Structures are given as structure tokens and as C-alpha cells.
Amino acid sequence: MATKWGICSTGRISNDFVVALSTLPAVDHQVVAVAARDLEKAKNFAQIHNIPKAYGSYEELAKDPDIDVIYVGAIHPVHRDVVLMCLQNGKNVLCEKPLAMNSAQVRELIAAARKFNVFLMEAFWSRFFPVYEEIRTLLSQKAIGDVKFIRAEFGTPIYTVPRAVEKELGGGALLDIGCYCVQFVTMVFNGEKPESVTARGFLHETGVDETISIILEYSGKRQAILSSTIMAALPNQTAICGTKGIIQIPSFMWSPTSVIVNGKETKFDVPHTTEPMNFSNGTGMSYEAEHVRQCLLKGLKESPIMSLADSEMIATIMDEALEQLGVMYP
């Protein structure tokens, strides 16, 4: 039986997710419906991607009995309300990052998923890339000894994009792209809570963070330094430094195709497509989609790789960092 997907929102990320699904076997994954707040946009998206049903409201999608799981690709500030509505209608949900605007909302969604006994996962697609799988394996094997220091950065000049700078749209470097650095460290340190969070940065004229650096300190004298900006391109690398070596992602840390371990590089190709894509290595979203299918087939209500506890920890760290910078969302 195919996993039947409903797509919530017709933005750029939803386009790439649907294209990524098309690289997987049709016997396993089918997109059966799409919803936008504008019916014409939904119809247009459905026509482009050969989706049978188009809805002019998210509520209709949430109530569609043919859907197994809903992918939420809408803007950040509506995540909480849309995901809650889907959960209340008994739908499994894969929601784009950030899962919600703050940790209180994340806890609310986790509680709702448990109450209604449905699957919920934050769509940090990075975690399902072969590079990330390789990193988890290397860490479990203590390939670089004890991890003492992590560096991660994600910067890209998107300061002209309203979604990235407007406070009402949930803009800002940390919520939009810096969150990938936070999830990376959270993965490496197995969801452990940092002993301290120190953030410094600069605010955009709109009041969101345009540049932010965070120092996380963990027990056992372990440290992570994360940097993110929407004002300039960064090398977008990561480094995990241990007592016996170093693991590096040389570029595209959020959707990587290569990893360097003690100077030796290994490459992994993402699925191929001829369809137009908006995001680098976007077909790699197929990895998270297949993971969701496997979780559902096993009857799981959360992912063992991108757990709800991790989502809560990521949101908690970001809350603390944004508070220190004085970023307040409506």
C-alpha cells in the first residue's frame, strides 16, 4: 500500500518536496491532495504535479479521509495552528522546521500528537541524508574519540526575501536557517541539554535577527559554536572535533553530499530529477519522506532519528538565544 500524502501550502519548499517524492517508487508514495489558502494556487500546483485534489483551505485537507500523512510547508507563524488542526483530525504530520515559533508551542503540539495518538515529526530533512547517517555511525563507533568541540554555520544572503526578514512571517536568521546548526549539535550530543547558552548578534531594522552567533557549553568541558546570517554567504561547513580526529561537512551542511573524516572524503549522490528545484540537493527530501513511511508502517508515533524531545530541545535553545538578542515575535 502506498503512503498517501496531502500537501499543505504551495510554496517553494512544497514544490521541492513533491518533486522529491516523485523520485521514489509510486507504489510506495502518492500525493493525493494539495491545499492553499487561495484555491487557484492549489489548482495550479495540482495541475503542475498531477495531484488529483485541490483545496482552497487547510481545513478541507485536514478532514480528507484519503490522506495518511500531511506535509506542512506553510510559513513559520501558522505551523502551530495548522499542525494542531491536522492532529485533531487524526492526521499524521511531517511539518517543516521550525515546528513552531517557540518551545511552548512545540510542547503543545507534542502533547496533542500524543493525545490524538498520531505521528508527528519536524522536517529536518538533513538528518536523513546518507552523510548524516554516516556521521551518526562514526560517532557511535567513537571513530574520532570523545567529541570536545563542534562548529557549524549557515549563512546565505536572503535579506531581500520578505519571509526571511518580516517579523510577521517568522523571519530571522535563527528560525529560518540557523536552526539547522542547532539541530546538528543536538544530534551530535544526543539531545543533551547545554549547561549554558550565550548568544550575540545584530537585529535587522524589522526587529528579527540578521546575524547571530551562539556558544553552547555542555558538561565535560564540551563546546559548540554556531553562526548564522541572512546578510552574506558563509562557507556553510561543520566540524566535529574529537580527541582522536575530526569529521567535517565541507559545504551545504543542511543538505550535504560529502563528508570528510580525518582528511578522507566520501561522496554520496542525491536522487536525480529533471524537474526544476528551488533548493540545493532538494531531491534529498525523499530520504525523510521514506523514513516517515517506514515509521508509519511500524506503527511509530515519532521518529527515532528526529525525536520530539529533540524538537523541544532545539526550540528551547533557540528561545534562549533569541531572548538574549531581544527578538520578540507577535
UniProtKB/Swiss-Prot annotation:
Its EC number is 1.3.1.20, 1.1.1.179. GO terms for biological process: D-xylose catabolic process. It comes from the Eukaryota. The record marks 176 as: May play an important role for the adaptation of the alcohol substrate into the binding site. Transmembrane segments: none annotated. InterPro entries: Gfo/Idh/MocA-like_OxRdtase_N (IPR000683), Gfo/Idh/MocA_domain (IPR050984), GFO_IDH_MocA-like_dom (IPR055170), NAD(P)-bd_dom_sf (IPR036291). It catalyses: (1R,2R)-1,2-dihydrobenzene-1,2-diol + NADP(+) = catechol + NADPH + H(+); D-xylose + NADP(+) = D-xylono-1,5-lactone + NADPH + H(+). The record marks 71, 79, 97 as: May play an important role in coenzyme binding. Keywords: NADP, Oxidoreductase. The record marks 180 as: May play an important role in catalytic activity. One of its GO terms (molecular function) is trans-1,2-dihydrobenzene-1,2-diol dehydrogenase activity. It is an enzyme of class 1 (oxidoreductase). Belongs to the Gfo/Idh/MocA family. Homodimer. This is Trans-1,2-dihydrobenzene-1,2-diol dehydrogenase. It comes from Xenopus laevis (African clawed frog).
